């Protein structure tokens, strides 16, 4: 797999679990002999939901809920077969969405 690049994009609602997953990926890739660029923090998506507190009236009384999606990007440059096997066996925390592009 010479001159190839694996791009890993991570998404999670909690930034601490996202950072631990990124650290595990970087540590695994460097241990197996590949170069790593990242983790690069990408912009956080912020979804805001406004809901009326009362069921029938009192429209002036509202409550707002926010949901943030944190993202990180990790590039693995010139991965070996050993790197790919180690990444496939890697156990990441739940709640982290992983997208891999070759």
UniProtKB/Swiss-Prot annotation:
InterPro entries, per database record: Ribosomal_uS10 (IPR001848), Ribosomal_uS10_CS (IPR018268), Ribosomal_uS10_dom (IPR027486), Ribosomal_uS10_dom_sf (IPR036838)
GO MF annotation, one: structural constituent of ribosome
Statement: the UniProt record of this protein carries the keyword Aminoacyl-tRNA synthetase: no
GO cellular component labels: ribonucleoprotein complex; ribosome
Gene3D superfamilies with a match to the protein in the record: Ribosomal protein S10 domain (3.30.70.600)
A Pfam match: Ribosomal_S10
Keyword tags: Ribonucleoprotein, Ribosomal protein
GO biological process, alphabetically ordered: translation
Coiled coil feature spans: none
HAMAP family: Ribosomal_uS10
Purpose: Involved in the binding of tRNA to the ribosomes.
Subunit structure: Part of the 30S ribosomal subunit.
Family classification: Belongs to the universal ribosomal protein uS10 family.
Record's protein name: Small ribosomal subunit protein uS10
Species per Swiss-Prot/TrEMBL record: Streptococcus pyogenes serotype M12 (strain MGAS2096)
Phylogenetic placement of the source organism: Bacteria, Bacillati, Bacillota, Bacilli, Lactobacillales
Gene: rpsJ
């Amino acid at each position: 797999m010479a001159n190839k690049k694996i791009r890993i994009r991570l998404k999670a609602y909690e930034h601490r679990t996202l950072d631990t997953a990124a650290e595990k990926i970087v540590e695994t890739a460097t241990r197996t002999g590949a170069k790593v660029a990242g983790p690069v923090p990408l912009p956080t998506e912020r979804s805001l939901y406004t809901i009326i507190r009362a069921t029938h009236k009192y429209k002036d009384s509202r409550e707002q809920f926010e949901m943030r999606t944190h993202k990180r990007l990790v590039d693995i440059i010139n991965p070996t077969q050993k790197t790919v096997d180690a990444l496939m066996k890697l156990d990441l925390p739940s709640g982290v969405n992983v997208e891999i592009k070759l």
